[in-house]
């Protein structure tokens, strides 16, 4: 029980740490809200990175997606299929591999992306939660290497 509480707190800190700069970044697709953030993995504590087997490096960004069902009270998190690509300004495309992380009532889809300093990416993310909603999420993000 104590281990689950620690994991919950670690995951909560992962999600909350991404919020200050990116609060309110979401799109509505039919009956779901798709929340997204992208940030340097050094924002994670070493403990959180280890707990979820995430690479913590100044040259690695994390893309965090969560899907909420707005047709239900309290907007609960729901499972979805998430895939996508990131294209830099040189036209180099990288396929994003999202990993689902479930913890209590929260569901996160996390992908790692190698970055260089001041690199800008155009993200093209496909999200499908069945009949609740399916569609594309597009956004740009500039990253800075943290050493």
Language-model regions: role of each:
Residues 8-17:
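Sec-dependent N-terminal signal peptides
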């Amino acid at each position: 029980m104590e281990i689950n509480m620690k994991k919950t707190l670690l995951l909560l800190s992962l999600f909350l740490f991404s919020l200050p700069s990116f609060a309110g970044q979401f799109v509505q697709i039919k009956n779901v809200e798709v929340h997204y953030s992208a940030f340097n993995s050094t924002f994670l504590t070493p403990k959180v990175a280890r707990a979820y087997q995430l690479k913590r490096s100044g040259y690695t960004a994390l893309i965090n997606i969560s899907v909420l069902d707005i047709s239900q009270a309290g907007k609960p998190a729901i499972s979805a299929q998430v895939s996508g690509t990131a294209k830099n300004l040189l036209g180099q495309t990288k396929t994003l591999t999202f990993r689902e992380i479930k913890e209590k009532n929260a569901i996160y889809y996390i992908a790692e992306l190698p970055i260089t300093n001041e690199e800008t990416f155009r993200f093209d993310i496909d999200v499908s939660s069945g009949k609740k909603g399916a569609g594309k999420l597009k956004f740009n993000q500039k990253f800075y290497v943290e050493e």
